[in-house]
Amino acid sequence: MGAMSPWHWAIVALVVIILFGSKKLPDAARGLGRSLRIFKSEVKEMQNDNSTPAPTAQQSAPAELPVADTTTAPVTPPAPVQPQHTEPKSA
């Protein structure tokens, strides 16, 4: 009872033809075919991109970088902050 018989498929096809018309169906099928073709080519391109790693530049030994001046001026600690005592105002 769950499977569709050929009569069910015929009725579905007839309803689709009536709803969309015989002129729009070939255009819709053509558009669907183009979309699937584009989708397949994009998937194939993504698979090719993932399987072949991108060519990397030659990794030669890094040239010696000039050493920056590492001496710094002595740091003086900040002056301690004394909390301000505020007395509650009497009303």
UniProtKB/Swiss-Prot annotation:
UniProt organism field: Rhodococcus jostii (strain RHA1)
Major location (coarse): membrane
Q: Where is this region: Disordered?
A: 44-91
**Membrane topology term:** Single-pass membrane protein
Q: Where in the cell is it found?
A: Cell membrane
Superkingdom of this protein's organism: Bacteria
Compositionally biased, Low complexity: which spans?
51-74
Task: Give the InterPro entries listed for this entry.
Answer: TatA/B/E, TatA/E
Its keywords, alphabetically, are: Cell membrane, Membrane, Protein transport, Translocation, Transmembrane, Transmembrane helix, Transport
Database matches in Pfam families: TatA_B_E
Query: What is the name of the protein in this document?
Result: Sec-independent protein translocase protein TatA
The entry lists its GO molecular-function terms as: protein transmembrane transporter activity
Q: Which family does it belong to?
A: Belongs to the TatA/E family.
Free-text function comment from the UniProt entry: Part of the twin-arginine translocation (Tat) system that transports large folded proteins containing a characteristic twin-arginine motif in their signal peptide across membranes. TatA could form the protein-conducting channel of the Tat system.
Q: Which is a GO BP term held by this UniProt record?
A: protein transport by the Tat complex
Kindly indicate whether the keyword Glycosyltransferase belongs to this entry.
no
Q: Where are the transmembrane segments?
A: 1-21
What Gene Ontology cellular-component terms does the record carry? TAT protein transport complex
- Assembly state and interactors? The Tat system comprises two distinct complexes: a TatABC complex, containing multiple copies of TatA, TatB and TatC subunits, and a separate TatA complex, containing only TatA subunits. Substrates initially bind to the TatABC complex, which probably triggers association of the separate TatA complex to form the active translocon.
